[in-house]
């Protein structure tokens, strides 16, 4: 923010998960951390908006087609790829860029991204 405040522009995007808005049995620590991150993003959004800095929180709910996911979950990936059920990094990036390019009169604070087959 040191460089953004004098310029009166900039974008900070936090990445969360469904746990940012909803807890689940066995995920107390994870949910608590994600909800705290969301609260930090909300506070920063309110503090920095008057200074021209756009702060957003993106919930990414679903597996992302990366080498790491492909290696750890090969059967899951195989099934999801049959139905276009994995998120692609470039598609996620397009949404982040869309947030960055929004005009000040129509800023998004929160965006949920998930494959069409994800249950939520």
What are the residue ranges of the model-derived segments?
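Short, hinge-like loop/turn segments at secondary-structure boundaries
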Residues: 31, 72-76
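Short beta-strand segments at enzyme active-site cores
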Residues: 10-14, 55-58
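Short beta-loop-alpha junction of Rossmann-like oxidoreductase domains
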Residues: 26, 53, 57-73
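Catalytic loop of short-chain dehydrogenase/reductase
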Residues: 5, 11-36, 41-42, 46-50, ...
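A broad, structure-centric signal for solvent-exposed, well-ordered loop/edge residues
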Residues: 22, 28, 67, 71, ...
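C-terminal helical subdomain
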Residues: 50-59, 75-120
């Amino acid at each position: 923010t040191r460089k953004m405040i004098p310029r009166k522009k900039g974008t900070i995007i936090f990445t969360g998960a469904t746990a940012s808005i909803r807890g689940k049995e066995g995920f107390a620590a994870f949910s608590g951390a994600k909800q705290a991150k969301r609260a930090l993003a909300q506070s920063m959004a309110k503090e920095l908006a008057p200074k021209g800095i756009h702060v957003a929180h993106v919930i990414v709910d679903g597996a992302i087609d990366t080498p790491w996911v492909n290696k750890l979950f090969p059967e899951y990936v195989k099934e999801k790829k049959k139905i276009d059920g994995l998120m692609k990094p470039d598609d996620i990036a397009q949404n982040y860029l869309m947030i960055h390019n929004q005009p000040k009169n129509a800023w998004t604070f929160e965006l949920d991204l998930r494959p069409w087959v994800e249950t939520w």
